[in-house]
Amino acid sequence: MQAEGAGTMHELSITQSILEISLKAAAEQHATRIRAIRLKLGAFSGVVPECVQMYLDVLAKGTIAEGAKIEAVTVPLRVECRACGTVSEIDRRHIACPACGSVDLHRLSGREFLVDSLEVDV
């Protein structure tokens, strides 16, 4: 059962992975503290940055990532129309080619989810 306003188990497991990746990368650079974790999230990734931050605040306690902030950049949904070849950015409200109206689209970006960079103390 999920409390109102709480994150989902989806974000919990994602946050665990983010923390593991970040701690490993920071250790390789001999970092003493992680100040920020920068993410690239596709508009259709399904990841809610506020939920990731909430879980990170709990999971990172006692690690060099304690107090780290999540900074997320959203990658727009880019598609190529199979009917006319137009490449464009679309959103959830208008899932059709803006040039010809076709819904036969090939996704080029928009589901990304990656740790892009860290801000650390060394």
Regions found by a protein language model. Give the residues of each.
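Short functional micro-motifs and their immediate structural scaffolds
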Residues: 89, 105-106
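Extended interfacial segments that mediate partner engagement and assembly in macromolecular machines
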Residues: 2-4, 8-23, 46-49, 65-71, ...
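Flanking scaffold residues of small Cys/His-coordinated metal-binding clusters
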Residues: 75-76, 91-92, 110
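Short, solvent-exposed secondary-structure boundary motifs
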Residues: 61, 94-97
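Short cysteine-rich clusters marking metal-coordination/redox-active sites
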Residues: 81-84, 97-100
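Cys/His-enriched microdomains
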Residues: 79, 95, 113
